[in-house]
Amino acid sequence: MKRVMDMWLSSTASLAQRRSQRQPCATAGAAPILALFFFALGFLMPVQAFAETVEQRIARLEPHYTIRRPENASGPAPVVIMLHGCGGPRPFISQMAEAAAEAGAAAIVVNSFAPRRISRVAAFATVCTGARLQGRERAGDLYATMAWARAQPWVDAARISVIGWSHGGWTIMDALALRSGEEMQRATGLENLSDEPLEGLAATMIVYPYTGVGTYTGRRDWRIAPRSTAIIAQRDYIVGSSRAALERQRARGAPMEILIFQNATHAFEDEHAEDPRVRYNPAATAREHDLLREMIAAL
């Protein structure tokens, strides 16, 4: 299996390099047949090559957290955990973290690639095609970050929220849908999870998520029911429309508001995107910031 992956990575390295500035979930790119093949291959490969404790996962993630805390906070503050898309951290996420701090919340930006030594080029070749680090595995990063956040004296553990873009949105919804116990441990590679690792999660914001093959969205009930807002970009030609899957999830009892951003593309917040399918939309970005502030105010 490793030999097959190495051969494919070698043959696609130049293509991935040319796309090094493009945005998450490039599954709909120039080689859809290969992308589909390797997405399917991801289900045949072990989700996690080794098991580790929650504390060990935290030790790997923590050096790469970017934390922005509100100024003049007089006590524990609400928190927004931020999960990037499959292209990795982007400048607009830092801007969202600043907006969260200005609204009175601390922001924890999770970099899921740095501790795994996944470069941006490798991410486009493997994560964006589904061959590596699928949402159910990355859910372990959210579980570990929740555990870390609850232990911080500056965090109000009853007012934790999470926002995820694209692959990050997939991660959030799979994290809510995994079954406690053996399935959750096998999917995330974490050995000592609590019965409910998302305890204290009060709200989510799910932005242009991938909801297709390999996700649990619309196919399973959530274990807990945080207030949720889902943003669909009307002109999303990267992950396609997620409306049907999100509506199925809502029909299963998820308290989710589904918003369609007209004339917005995937990664509409990214001023520096080079992918022709992506267009920066300042009005949509401002609206997203408003929704973030509303979520924080309601915590």
Residue ranges of model-derived segments:
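N-terminal secretory signal peptides that target proteins for export/translocation
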Residues: 1-28
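Bacterial N-terminal signal peptides
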Residues: 32-45
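Serine-hydrolase catalytic machinery in alpha/beta-hydrolase-like enzymes
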Residues: 54-69, 76-155, 170, 268-276
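Primarily recognizes the serine-hydrolase "nucleophile elbow" in alpha/beta-hydrolase
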Residues: 143-223
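Short beta-strand/loop motif that positions the catalytic acidic residue
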Residues: 230-232
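Acidic beta-to-alpha connecting loop that harbors the catalytic carboxylate
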Residues: 234-237, 263-265
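Conserved alpha/beta-hydrolase "acid-adjacent" motif
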Residues: 237-244
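C-terminal catalytic histidine-bearing segment of alpha/beta-hydrolase fold enzymes
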Residues: 255-299
